[in-house]
Amino acid sequence: MSVEWNNPEGGNPIAKGWWPYEQSGYMIDGLYRCGIFLRDSVLMQLGSDNVGYVLSHPRANGMLGPETLGENQWAFSVFARTLLAYYDYTEDDRIPVLLKKHFSALNDTLTNRQTCIIESMCKMYSYTGDKEILQKAGHIWDLFSMNGGTKDNEVFIHGDMVSSKPIDVHGVTAAEVSKQPLILYLYTGRQEYLDAALGSILPWNGKTNFQMGYRLHMKACFLSMRKRCMRPVISVTLYGVTVTC
């Protein structure tokens, strides 16, 4: 049986680790968005039920998600995409309020895939204009990557990213973490973020191998649920950053 983010009563098991919530987060996000475009009430209800339970059961410190996750932000970063899709479709005003409390409760010293919560922080900033959220997102990345980075930083030291130092790390980690500075660049305009993002991509394909058609599409720029149209998609190529509408 899949572990959902929904009510543990009624047969939904409680996982002891973080990875079942990561996997169910992917599943719920995909099925909910699919339900919206197909107007499938069953799939939409799956998303709504999980979102509703998470929003109505915040922890004492304001963080969202099951207590068993502790401060693990990677699994929540995956599920947060469902929260943002739900907000985009319903404009449920609980989401910006509760996500702000969640972000405020975060430890500043997040590392590696935990930093992927930056994606949702920046997206919520785009909705609300709350500069405190954006500033904290930047602060989390700066502590993790800048000035030599943290001791447990796997391969995302700023200087190494800019210089395109070859990396040896889990593929999902490489893809998810390396896009965070690009997302920050979109909302802050800080050149050092763009330099890090572009530099980190080159080792994946080789400096002359982009003719194979590789493009990195930002998950942060997702489909607009309300307007039924495509938001601009940010693509990274050897030739720079392009926007596809």
Language model features with spans:
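Glycan-recognition and catalytic cores of secretory/periplasmic carbohydrate-active enzymes
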Residues: 1-245
